[in-house]
Amino acid sequence: MLSLLLVLGLLRLNAQTNYSVYGVGFYNQENLFDTCHDEGKKDYDFLPTGSYKWDKLKYTNKLRNMARALADMGTDVLPKVGCAMIGLSEVENARVLDALVAQPPLAARGYRYIHVEGPDRRGIDCALLYNPQLFTPQTVKLVPYIPQLPKDSAFRTRGYL
C-alpha cells in the first residue's frame, strides 16, 4: 500500500505543469492633469487659476502618490516585479505620462506607456503602462465609444485603448 502511494505521488509530481504568471492591473488616475493648458481642451479647472487651484505642489504630490500605488500593484503575488501592464484612465496627455513613469518607483521597473489622444473635450484620455521586459505591444488602436442612445449622439468621450 505504501509503495502504491509513493508511485501515485511521483506520477503526480511529474504531471505538474509550469505556468508563467503576469500581473495585469487597472487604475483610474482620477484626473491626472498637469498645470498647463492644452489647446482645444477644456482643462481650465486644472490650471493654477482654475476652480481646483491646481498648482505644481498638488500635481507633484499626485504624481508621487500615483506612482507609489501603481508600483505596489501586483507585488503581493509577484514581489519586486509587480504588474506587467496597467491600464490607466483619466490621464491628460503624454506630458503627464512622461512625468509619471519618471517617478522613482516606476522608473526603477522601466515602465513605458502607450497613449493615444482621444476626442474627449475635457482632455481625459486612456493609456497603458507596461514593463517592456514582460510585455511587448504589437499594435495600438483607440476604439471609439459608440453612443447607444440617440440623445448621446453629440457626446464625445474617451474610447477604449
Question: Across the structure, where does each feature detected by a protein language model lie?
Answer:
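Conserved beta strand-loop-helix elements of the APE1-like EEP
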Residues: V91-E92, R121-T139
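N-terminal, active-site-proximal structural segment of metallo-dependent hydrolase catalytic domains
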Residues: A15-G110, I114-I124
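Short Gly/Pro-enriched turn/cap motifs at secondary-structure boundaries
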Residues: E117-P119, P150-F155
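Flexible, glycine-/basic-rich loop-and-beta segments that form/coincide
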Residues: P137-L149
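Bacterial Sec-dependent N-terminal signal peptides
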Residues: M1-Y19
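Metal-dependent phosphoester-hydrolase catalytic domains
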Residues: A15-Q16, A154-R156
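Short, surface-exposed beta-strand/loop micro-motifs that present aromatic residues
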Residues: R158-L161
